[in-house]
Every structure is written in structure tokens, then in C-alpha cells.
Regions:
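Short, glycine-/aromatic-enriched active-site segment of Class I SAM-dependent methyltransferases
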Residues: 33-35, 39-42, 209-235, 240-246
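Conserved catalytic loop of SAM-dependent methyltransferase domains
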Residues: 32-38, 254-279
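Conserved N-terminal segment of class I S-adenosyl-L-methionine
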Residues: 1-173, 177-181, 191-194, 257-261, ...
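Short glycine/proline- and charge-enriched loop/turn segments
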Residues: 39-45, 83-90, 222-230, 269-276
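A short glycine-rich, Lys/Arg-flanked "PGG" loop and its adjoining helix->strand segment in the class I
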Residues: 191-206
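A short His-aromatic
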Residues: 182-186
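A short hydrophobic/small-residue beta-strand
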Residues: 138, 207-208
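Short N-terminal helix/helix-N-cap motif within the alpha/beta-hydrolase-1
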Residues: 188-192, 219
Length: 313
């Protein structure tokens, strides 16, 4: 544990309520917590780290079926840990940005071309670079990790705010498109985040989200061994609960769909639920050869969602 960014020795965990139903006490336990909260540090909250199987107590809402963590660290601890997190995925960022740009093009098909776009949890701005290359005039981002922002292209750095996103981050009706990629399942108040997005979108604007799909076959088969069952994830959505949370926060859902990701073979191997005795030598072999750099496209248990803020009648 890094002394400078560890949680205090006896962290206070806070109870969560279902963000769809808005209630507490409608849950059944799915997995008990398996870690000591005092041992958490910023390395655990760094994006795309090698899975370590740590997770909160996870419960399922008996009303809507949403899988979520309960209880979790309070916002002030999460803010500090994400703020001090490391940017360790520069190699994958190029692949990731191109994948997300492909889905943005599809989402915009048949719609007026947007003038402005904002990304929540933009990291080093790798997707913002792609959006700018697509011809979107104004690109903006919000990112809690200062280290990630320092890796952004110089022309983008002043367009990225170092903060946790909320309703006061921007003025109302500022953007035509808001995107969040592998961010929504990390948010302690997901309904609040969606209400902020709704506020910051212009009428007729669109959100595009990509995140894990708890209902995907791979994740259902792996259960607690799935990489998505992780201490960073405050809630995990399937296609039904993703649609429902968008609808209860005012959005009109256009589409919820499966997502195909392209990454180097070495990255997929790092995520695979293999024993360390097998995974560690395999990763070393892939790093020594060029085989680990081969791009591989897979449906790997992610979903996408497109929803709009309808114009007033």
C-alpha cells in the first residue's frame, strides 16, 4: 500500500440504494466482500490493471435485477483514490479510441452532425483525439486522474477538467453528444450522473455509453471469477437494467447492443481468468515475441447504449 494514497486504517463504508428503484432493503446477497478496505490504494483504482479478484459485497435488487456493490467507500475516498490513480494503458489506448470512434460513427448515422462532444472519464483524451479527427469542432473531457491528463496531446490538455463529473461541472445545455466508456459501472451515484448528463445535453442531444454487460454469456458462466466482479465497480448492468436506468432518468433509449472490442492478444491474455502459474509465464512469452501485439477482435461481455434527450413538444 502506498502511504500517500491509501484509505484510512478503518474506512467507513456507506450503504447504497438501488439507483433504478430508489430503495434500500430490496436486495439479496450474491457475493460476500473478500478484501480488507484498509488495504485499498490508488493502484487498485487504476484503469485496466491486471484483475486481482477483489470486490465489495455484491447484491442483486429483487425488483429490477440490478447487480451492485453494497456497501462501498464514500465519495471522498473514491475521489482521492481515482485522483491518485496511475495511467498504465497507453499501449491499449490507440485500439480503444478507434473502437469507440467506430461506435460513435454508427450512433450518429442519420443524425445531424454534432458541433460539441464531452467525454466523462476521458483518461488521456485518446477518444477525444479521434472525435476531433472526425470533424467535431468542440471536444471536452472530465477526468479525475491528473497523471492521465498529463499524457494527453498538448492541444487537448486545456480541454480536460481534472475533476469528478457532476451536474455543476458545466453549464446546462452545453453539448450535442456526451460519451462515457467503461466509466458508468464505476460511478457511486449512477442516477445522479445520468441526471447531470441530461442537464448538460442540448435538446435533441445524445448519450453513447459502453460498459460491462453482466448478462453476457461469458460473465454469467464465470460468475464471481469474471473480471467485471471488481472493487472498482459500484454497479453492473445487463441490457434490461441499462435500458431502465436511462429511462427513469428521463432519456429515450434508442438502442442497447453488444460491443465488439479490438485489443492486442497480450491484453486479452492479461484479462483471462487463468491461474497465475499459467498466466504469468504466458504473458512473459507474449511480451518477448511480437505475437502479443496481434490485434484480436472479440465480443467480450460489453454492451453499448444510445439514448436521447427529446426536444420539448
Amino acid at each position: 500500500v502506498h502511504a500517500s494514497d491509501a484509505v484510512t486504517p478503518a474506512p467507513r463504508l456507506v450503504t447504497t440504494r438501488c439507483p433504478i428503484c430508489g430503495e434500500e432493503g430490496t436486495d439479496r446477497e450474491v457475493y460476500p466482500a473478500n478484501f480488507d478496505p484498509a488495504a485499498l490504494d490508488s493502484a487498485v483504482f487504476s484503469a485496466r490493471r491486471t484483475p486481482d479478484r477483489l470486490h465489495y459485497r455484491m447484491v442483486r435488487c429483487v425488483r429490477c435485477g440490478l447487480l451492485r456493490s453494497n456497501p462501498i467507500l464514500p465519495l471522498e475516498d473514491l475521489s482521492r483514490l481515482y485522483g491518485a490513480s496511475r495511467f498504465t494503458y497507453q499501449r491499449e489506448a490507440e485500439f480503444t479510441g478507434k473502437t469507440y470512434a467506430t461506435y460513435l460513427r454508427r450512433a450518429l448515422a442519420g443524425r445531424p452532425w454534432p458541433r460539441s462532444l464531452m467525454e466523462v472519464g476521458c483518461g488521456s483524451g485518446f477518444f477525444l483525439s479521434e472525435a476531433a479527427r472526425m470533424g467535431i469542432e468542440e471536444v471536452s473531457g472530465v477526468e479525475p486522474s491528473q497523471e492521465a491528463i498529463e499524457h494527453a496531446e498538448p492541444r487537448l490538455r486545456d480541454r480536460i477538467r481534472c475533476a469528478l463529473y457532476d451536474s455543476e461541472t458545466f453549464e446546462a445545455e452545453r453539448f450535442d453528444v456526451i460519451c462515457a466508456f467503461q466509466v458508468f459501472d464505476h460511478v457511486p451515484d449512477p442516477a445522479g450522473m445520468l441526471r447531470a448528463c441530461f442537464r448538460h445535453l442540448r435538446p435533441g442531444g445524445m448519450v453513447l455509453f459502453i460498459n460491462h454487460d453482466s448478462g453476457a454469456l461469458t460473465n454469467r458462466l464465470l460468475g464471481e471469477r469474471s473480471p467485471i466482479v471488481d472493487v472498482e465497480h459500484t454497479a453492473l448492468y445487463d441490457r434490461s437494467t441499462m435500458r431502465r436506468i436511462l429511462e427513469v432518468t428521463g432519456f429515450t433509449v434508442q438502442q442497447v447492443f453488444g460491443v465488439k472490442n479490438t485489443y492486442p492478444l497480450e491484453y486479452w491474455t492479461r484479462l483471462a481468468p487463468l491461474p497465475s502459474l499459467v498466466k504469468d509465464p504466458l504473458l512473459k512469452a507474449l511480451e518477448r515475441s511480437r505475437v502479443g501485439e496481434l490485434p484480436v477482435s472479440l465480443y467480450a461481455g460489453n454492451l453499448g447504449a444510445i439514448a436521447t434527450k427529446e426536444r420539448p413538444q
